[in-house]
């Protein structure tokens, strides 16, 4: 495995670990805290912010980044918008979309590097 392939593999594993930690927050957070507006930040809105940022980070080109639209809009980015509620199911579905997008991106990068490695290994 080349150094580049190893870096992509490590980055993929770390990205997956970060998504797993986010999933743990969604699954393990008690319902009474999930939409609790008595604190500085609302957990469901904070998780949405994390997911939208993760989704944005998977954009492959500047054009994709420039035209990026957050799945559920901007209002969840205030962290304390009583009009914006995100259910656990809603954010779990979004997380699954991001996982699939990340898997596709990292698999494509790995495949491209394998082809490059094979080409460079030719006599």
PLM region spans:
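A glycine-rich, coil/turn loop motif that links secondary-structure elements
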Residues: 34-43, 120-123
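Histidine-centered divalent metal-coordination motifs
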Residues: 49
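Conserved PLP-dependent catalytic core of the aminotransferase class-I/II
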Residues: 19-22
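Short, helix-capping/interhelical loops that line the mouth of catalytic, cofactor-
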Residues: 1-10, 53-122
């Amino acid at each position: 495995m080349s150094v580049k392939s190893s870096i992509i593999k490590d980055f993929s594993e770390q990205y997956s670990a970060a998504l797993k930690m986010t999933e743990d927050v969604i699954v393990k957070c008690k319902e009474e805290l999930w939409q609790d507006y008595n604190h500085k930040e609302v957990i469901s809105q904070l998780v949405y912010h994390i997911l939208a940022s993760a989704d944005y980070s998977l954009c492959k080109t500047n054009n994709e980044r420039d035209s990026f639209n957050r799945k559920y809009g901007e209002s969840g980015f205030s962290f304390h918008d009583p009009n914006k509620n995100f259910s656990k199911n809603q954010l779990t579905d979004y997380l699954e979309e991001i996982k699939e997008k990340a898997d596709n991106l990292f698999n494509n990068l790995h495949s491209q590097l394998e082809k490059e490695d094979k080409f460079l290994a030719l006599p």
